[in-house]
Amino acid sequence: MLARGKTNLKIEEIRMHKHHEIHRVKPLMPALCRIRQGKKVINWETHTLTVDNNQIILFPCGYEFYIENYPEAGLYLAEMLYLPIDLIESFQKLYTVTDQIRNKTSFFLPQNPELIYCWEQLKTSVSRGFSTKIQEHLAMGVLLSLGVNHVNHLLLSYSKQSLISRCYNLLLSEPGTKWTANKVARYLYISVSTLHRRLASEGVSFQSILDDVRLNNALSAIQTTVKPISEIARENGYKCPSRFTERFHNRFNITPREIRKASRE
């Protein structure tokens, strides 16, 4: 069963009034982005994609994206749907992907009436605090409306069993905790040397994962809440606001205040 208390499934709204650019954004969970107004330009690896309110964007974990958001008539409005790995793995067990489609890459699809209907139903269930099982059932409808093969290829690119994914899930549960490699290794029931060795084999370091989680989680909070930036910094493990601003700017090439400024009319 999927439902074991509170789900990680969530929908967040991004509302901006000025053009802005954010570098090296790395989704911490598989996500869908529905543009409601304006357009988004996405760059990753050697690809560039421009998306408006006629398409849905599929963001898999494991990629870094360079993003520009452009308002239309003074407003950029988008909704992000974050999907827990458990739910997607259950979807994969229920619906089979074909190898022929698995190897194709496309990070956007046209919106369709089924998708819009299922999305609105899911959004209502989340806003009203409906049960976890109901939310997961409606999320399955959203995934089905995209097409089984697209979901499997684009949203299942990150295995729950990978050490990176396990570290993401652990750190994201309490990003403000004073995490060390030793503490994470104890939680995962492995030695710290094994942790470092296996992360290196997956092409990352412990510090890079910790930075990914804290900075991308902070970015989401800055875009979707009105919390003070200093509070967001503390919640993500940064006691010094100026240090947080420096790390944030080095990562995203934009400061927290510049993002907040873009959100004001």
Curated annotation (Swiss-Prot):
Keywords assigned by UniProt, alphabetized: DNA-binding, Transcription, Transcription regulation
Keyword Transcription: yes
UniProt xrefs under SUPFAM superfamilies: Homeodomain-like
InterPro entries, alphabetized: Homeodomain-like_sf, HTH_AraC
DNA-binding is among the record's keywords: yes
DNA-binding region: 182-203, 229-252
Molecular function, one GO term: transcription cis-regulatory region binding
All copies of domain HTH araC/xylS-type, residue ranges: 165-262
An individual GO BP term: DNA damage response
Additional remark text: Encoded by the cryptic lambdoid prophage DLP12.
Protein name in the entry: Uncharacterized HTH-type transcriptional regulator YbcM
Species this protein is from: Escherichia coli (strain K12)
